[in-house]
């Protein structure tokens, strides 16, 4: 989390009544929008978590609109109902109005509601019921969310949705297996959105998720959310598949950067007073590592010596990167942001933002 907003999506899982439930937290901000759509593509249902006092927030509207457009049926959880300023009943009316405003269909409007306190670890269908545990939520997930439609007879195919770097394994790709089975040491290939082959490689390691840990496994099957290692240049939105497969899985392309800043070494008189990592080589390596694992960030070396151009989808995204680097002990100078233009068919195109202002 950063500034109260989830900025990275991380998968986990729990086993309840002999059923494995995969859980993924999505980012809630438009700057990380491409990731939201890809994450929702891995799911069969969603839990909409709303604060009992604050009600639906702007990011609630953004993520919910994406979920409803994909046909997912939400479970609504009103959290923090034990707050002194909680107004659960009013918040439910606000949520229903939001569903209607976002053109939810009849099935989506008939959403189940649970009242909860995440801090104390309980949830119930009614506010005055005994407050014990989260079993009602787990039971509701089993009853309300459809099982994944899988076909084990088809050749292996999975969609790369998340990317992270591991010191020992190198590039690791996380995604959901859509159909088929894969084993360690299988030879696979990857396809981009245009069905062009990206590379061919061997699956050196396979992991599933349990709690907050990655668990090594020899075999993965359709429906699993897995992490694979062994591919060197495959990225997010690529399809990892059996050598026989020639058609990539449909997904949302990565949103291009809309703005950039120039990052240089700190050459001010107070250089070196706060941070330990002050050289351009250190800054360059850190930015390259970020661009490798964060597909929404672009990196380019500037014509000017020791300066680097970093592109992202908004001020929040770039601000979070700079703040993280500062905490890690880096010192750097940052230019004012500039808008990125694009030339297409001899026309100059610029990014635009859609603003919705709610007035009560």
Kindly give the residue locations of the regions a language model identified:
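Structural and coupling elements of P-loop NTPases
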Residues: 1-360
